[in-house]
Swiss-Prot record:
Residues 43-96, 144-152 are lumenal. This is Derlin-2.2. The gene is DER2.2. GO terms for cellular component: endoplasmic reticulum membrane. May be involved in the degradation process of specific misfolded endoplasmic reticulum (ER) luminal proteins. Expressed in roots, stalks, leaves, immature ears, embryo and endosperm. The chain crosses the membrane at residues 22-42, 97-117, 123-143, 153-173. Induction: Not induced by endoplasmic reticulum stress. It comes from Zea mays (Maize). Associated with ER-derived protein bodies in endosperm. It comes from the Eukaryota.
Amino acid sequence: MAQAVEEWYRQMPIITRSYLTAAVVTTVGCTLEIISPYHLYLNPKLVVQHYEIWRLVTNFLYFRKMDLDFLFHMFFLARYCKLLEENSFRGRTADFFYMLLFGATVLTGIVLIGGMIPYISETFARILFLSNSLTFMMVYVWSKHNPFIHMSFLGLFTFTAAYLPWVLLGFSILVGSSTWVDLLGMIAGHVYYFLEDVYPRMTGRRPLKTPSFIKALFADDNVVVAQPPNAGIGAGARFGAIGVDPQAQ
């Protein structure tokens, strides 16, 4: 069993493995009280006035306490991060890293701007960690790249992957969870998808071209990946209590 887990871990692509490792280490460290979540959460005042710049990164690494919900989040993170890195971004590690960096920037910007708008500022002030939103962004981008994959919600009904983010959002509403996390991830994912996939087809220009200094950090081969219209890829488990599995083709 241990050997199988080790092999599974070693076979992960570099970005997925690094992010998953950082998330697990951070959450375990907080659970064991080695570090405190109060030193990790997003606080614009502390970032600007006290130069605690690390909060811009650490708020994406903490997934709350270790419980069943945490395990589902880690499964979701590992699955969709890996699917994107190995398929849509195969041979383009720098582009994938830039996607995550762009998504994190958009999410942070939304929270900062929302915190300055009357009537909704209190809602955004309660958003301390954006790790779940970044994971949801990856789900959204994956669904846009694989819209025709057939999926099943707990065997109750089937749908195509294009509707996966909306199914998960509906489940959050059904169980009474906050939908802000999902909505922020969907917004960031759609902004990225539009600028990277839709806008270039409309204008011939690519505004999100990965900077050369980021490309220099990764040794990639140029690989063109053909995406099949249908593939046996499931959604895994929903945050906390939901299973979404592929429908047999």
